[in-house]
Amino acid sequence: MVRTMPIERVRNIGIAAHIDAGKTTTTERILFYSGIVHKMGEVHYGTAVTDWMAQERERGITITAAAISTKWLDHQINIIDTPGHVDFTIEVERSMRVLDGIIAVFCSVGGVQSQSETVWRQADRYQVPRMAFINKMDRTGANFFKVYEQIRDRLRANAVPIQIPIGSENEFTGIVDLVAMKALIYNDDQGTDIQETEIPADVEKLAQEYRLKLVESVAETDDALTEKYLEGEELTAEEIRKALRLATISGTVVPILCGSAFKNKGIQLLLNAVVDYLPAPQEVPAIQGTLPNGELDVRPADDEAPLASLAFKIMSDPYGRLTFLRVYSGVLAKGSYILNSTKDKKERISRLIVLKADDRIEVDELRAGDLGAVVGLKDTLTGDTICDKDNPIILESLYVPEPVISVAVEPKTKQDIDKLSQALQALSDEDPTFRVSVDPETNQTVIAGMGELHLEILVDRMLREYKVKANVGKPQVAYRETIRQQIQAEGKFIRQSGGKGQYGHVVIELEPGDPGSGFEFVSKIVGGTVPKEFISPAEQGMKEACEAGVLAGYPLIDVKATLVDGSYHDVDSSEMAFKIAGSMAIKEGVIKASPVLLEPMMKVEVEVPEDFIGNIIGDLNSRRGQIEGQGLETGMAKVMAKVPLAEMFGYATDMRSKTQGRGVFSMEFSNYEEVPHNVAETIISKSRGYV
């Protein structure tokens, strides 16, 4: 088959923001104006197309990243609508990994909020070009210019308005296009009767001021334009568009647009900007991966290149198990056999589909730059590479944060026992931040995730989708352990009891790893002191030993083990013996390497009336909080702090009583930090049953 849409006309974009900034409504309007849906869906009525899970429609929030394909101005736009709630950060993270551009939506009243900063950091991590849409210009208190300044100051972005609003709140009637220097006035409620006119006199001066900022910003990106500008010549609209496109794709400029998705204003102009300024797949750097020989290679966004694609999401639905893929290069065809190079397993592509929310459209192939889903892959999980079996490559996987909260779950009846394990397996396949383990002492099943809402939604899904009734315990903090010193340790496993014995011996250097690195293993064996076939079992033993630390039995993270020496026996050595030796080396080494307890720290942002600021700061300090910043805006005080999760249970109730119900707060995971000695002693004693 030939390509129906040239790759230069494809846009893979995400819509991301803080909760309640209006992302899903913006997506709905995009689908309406591009003709995918013929009736506008509303989040608050539970009719949004991209919110297809029952919980999403009930709660009015987006939980999973829904992928949808639409067309605009003879371009194919693949859109991912991502959640804004911090508990579902992994959904945003995996979307960023496979997108070429982002629309960051900001509320014109709330402005830059904590999750806005998280989304921005995630986009920075994957170097995703972006533009900003300042939404809800019709709301009381809307202030486009305040939010513009916040984007520049708090996000340190070179943000440049390419539009300014005409009026705000009830008086928001149109938009000035600063590139074309024309006004667009909305004459109806549907946003379809748009009148292009000269710029009204009351905003003419402001428009000239911001047009000058735009021209200066784009002129700086191109020597020829700089010269033209310095000589006093006028830049044409076409020259500005071309330079702005290159500057947006390179990440040096962030164009700012405005509108009101709910009131149907500004969406067509936003779609035009996606086509004009966000990149096609071949305009972003080619994806890099590792070949079997360890060398790095790239796969260009070209149908003729060998197939390379990344599984970025697993989803169970009535149609079966869907594996969402981004195809970076080559063609993925129905009926073909492919290689999961991450697991070194071959799989068959039985069916391929693209999504329009509830509608699944079967296709024969996905080409370079496409987003779609495969039905029925058995071994593929999130972050795995799917590639051509004759040209294997492993792409960089996804960054998955450690879970911060856990609860014990148990089936209510005997009939629920098998169903519970099946449900937990399916849900953990879908969501890499959802971990399932069994407490070795109590034999209870423990589930861990990114927050209370995250676990609440998953327990709810067990009941709805898998018909499992479960009792859920109290939330527990997901502590971790690590080491502070570099040491050498050995593990020697010898067993002689007549007949064939067991012999495995390894020597390792154990040292602290980089934050967020988990467990890292390196082999520096030379001369065959440990045969090649025993290195992998030794590594596996070490990994398994890291599942329970020596202080309080919490998982060991951010450690690096280097295999430097060892010995073997021609007859008695086996994979099992080296696996046990690896485990022994870690356990012995950790005791000597100054082990410490780590706890999850949360980034907390509290907004309260000015009068209550003293109470709030005092309360956060009493919770072992570190105050990181304060601000004042229109009678409301904002406090930014880092607080241990262990101290934040029940905070919502306490804060409401301290502020007479007038305060709001948001909380998201920041990082793991060492627990103070006196607190750690209590936690360790409790884990050992002394308290």
Swiss-Prot record:
Protein localization: Cytoplasm
Binding locations of GTP: 17-24, 81-85, 135-138
SUPFAM superfamilies, per database record: EF-G C-terminal domain-like, P-loop containing nucleoside triphosphate hydrolases, Ribosomal protein S5 domain 2-like, Translation proteins
Coiled-coil residue windows: none
GO molecular function, one term: GTPase activity
Keyword Translocase assigned: no
Gene Ontology BP terms: ribosome disassembly
Domain tr-type G as annotated: residue spans: 8-282
Keywords: Cytoplasm, Elongation factor, GTP-binding, Nucleotide-binding, Protein biosynthesis
Pfam assignment, any one: GTP_EFTU_D2
Annotated GO CC locations: cytoplasm
Keyword Zinc: no
InterPro entries linked: EFG_II, EFG_III, EFG_III/V, EFG_IV, EFG_V, EFG_V-like, EFTu-like_2, G_TR_CS
Major localization listed first in the record, in broad terms: cytoplasm
Family, similarity comment: Belongs to the TRAFAC class translation factor GTPase superfamily. Classic translation factor GTPase family. EF-G/EF-2 subfamily.
Role: Catalyzes the GTP-dependent ribosomal translocation step during translation elongation. During this step, the ribosome changes from the pre-translocational (PRE) to the post-translocational (POST) state as the newly formed A-site-bound peptidyl-tRNA and P-site-bound deacylated tRNA move to the P and E sites, respectively. Catalyzes the coordinated movement of the two tRNA molecules, the mRNA and conformational changes in the ribosome.
Classification via NCBIfam families: EF-G (TIGR00484), PRK12740.1-3 (NF009379), PRK12740.1-5 (NF009381), small_GTP (TIGR00231)
UniProt-recorded name of the protein: Elongation factor G 1
